[in-house]
Regions:
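S-adenosyl-L-methionine
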Residues: 1-52
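Short amphipathic alpha-helix with an adjacent loop that forms part of the alpha/beta core around
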Residues: 48, 101-113, 132-133
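Residue-level preference for short coil/turn positions at secondary-structure junctions
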Residues: 52-53, 76, 112-114, 138, ...
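Structural motif
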Residues: 56-58, 116, 141
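SAM cofactor-binding core of SAM-dependent methyltransferases
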Residues: 56-108
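Short, solvent-exposed loop/turn segments at secondary-structure junctions
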Residues: 63-65, 87-88, 123-125, 148-150
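A short SAM/SAH-binding and catalytic strip from SAM-dependent methyltransferases
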Residues: 114-127
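C-terminal substrate-binding/active-site "lid" region of AdoMet-derived donor-dependent transferases
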Residues: 124-186
Length: 187
């Protein structure tokens, strides 16, 4: 068994996911290769929310994979796979858990196998609708993380879909200008 720990350039020194996780505190902190400010509170919350193995979460637009890598490092019973348009962007998700699609509108065909989806700072609300319409039949819930100011552009994509039961957890270690929304199927 080989464990490959990706490295990141942070503050002039090389750091792996273990070293980065030790820098986390309850207060959100910015990292150069993640749009979302990250805190130990947020990682703990997401690890408790996301499904446990053998189920997995698909992070659509995972970027460097820092958030996803920190979640898996925190709780190894959680599996998070990434989807991105370019595999070279990824630095923290294990290669076998990284999936590449052709372009910003590309859908990963096995997305319906995931128990949950996570969108972190997504660029286009229409991509969420496209995923829901194409692969949303078997997904249990969707987590949206991004700027509060952007939520109004995304809210209709959820409220007009099967995932219209929305919750807005607070006190989970985000900055005041960021939010998380958990979208579940309406009952």
């Amino acid at each position: 068994l080989f464990v490959i720990t990706p490295l990141a350039k942070l503050g002039g020194e090389e750091m792996d996911i273990s070293q980065i996780s030790k820098q986390l505190s309850p207060a959100p902190k910015r990292f150069p290769d993640c749009c979302l400010a990250i805190s130990s509170t947020l990682i703990s919350y997401l690890a408790s929310l996301l499904p446990k193995k053998p189920a997995f979460t698909l992070s659509i637009g995972s970027g460097s994979g820092l958030l996803e890598g920190l979640i898996v490092h925190y709780d190894q019973n959680v599996s998070v796979e990434g989807v991105e348009v370019d595999s070279t962007i990824n630095r923290y998700i294990a290669e076998e858990d990284m999936n590449v699609v052709g372009g910003g509108w590309g859908l990963w065909s096995a997305a319906q196998q995931a128990a949950a989806w996570m969108f972190v700072y997504p660029r286009d609300p229409k991509l969420i609708t496209k995923y829901i319409d194409t692969h949303g039949d078997t997904v249990d819930f969707i987590v949206w993380l991004g700027p509060r100011v952007d939520w109004s552009d995304y809210e209709p994509r959820f409220s007009q879909s099967p995932f219209s039961e929305l919750s807005f957890p607070d006190q989970i270690g985000l900055t005041p200008y960021e939010t998380v929304v958990v979208a579940r199927r309406a009952t």
